[in-house]
Structure formats: structure tokens, C-alpha cells
Amino acid sequence: MTTSTSQQELFQFLEDRFACAQACTECARACALRASMVDPDGAEEQELLRRKGIMCAEVCDATCRVLSEESHLDEAGIRVQLEWCRSVCLECAQVLDRHPGAEAAAKACRECAQACTDFIDTLH
């Protein structure tokens, strides 16, 4: 492997990592906003939406921090974080699908899950 090839791979890795962190940030923002719009004393389905939205926002925020900061996690630890984020995002998207007006947040969740999948695929 030449130096330029390894540098190109490093640049691509960093770009993919940043894209995943950015998708996590967008999802966290969308879910936090959607959760804040739900009546905390609402029906059981509203409470489920609020809890899933808050959980998704927190997991996405934590994942973004892992990806954007100098982390002491090894590759296996990063993979576990990404898989957890992907799972939580997909669960949240399913709940959001049942609520009119939550389409943008559901889309952000799915995009984040896909970004996590894509980045996992770059890990060895």
C-alpha cells in the first residue's frame, strides 16, 4: 500500500465518520424536538412516543460524541455504540410512523440508522 493510498483511505474513513456523526446530530435534534411537543400527561401512546424520542436523542448524542471526540474506545467499542444507535433509531422510527406530523423525525431516524450501518461496514 502506498502512502497516498493509505492517506486516501484515512481521509475517506474520517469523512464517513463525520457523516455518521452528523446524521446522529440531526436525529438527536429531530427526536428531542418531537418529544418536546408531546403532552407529558398524554395517553399511553403519546408517552411511548415521548420516551422513545428522548431515548433516541440521548443515544444519538452519545454516539455523536464517541465519533467526534478523541475516544478511548477501541474499534469493537465503537461498533457496539453504532449498533446500539442503529437499533434505537429504527425502534423510534417505527413509533414515529404511527403519529401524523412526525414524518421528518422518522426520516432522520432512518437516515441515522443507515449512516451507522454504512460506517460499521468501514470498520475492520
Residue ranges of model-derived segments:
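Amphipathic alpha-helical hairpins
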Residues: M1-H124
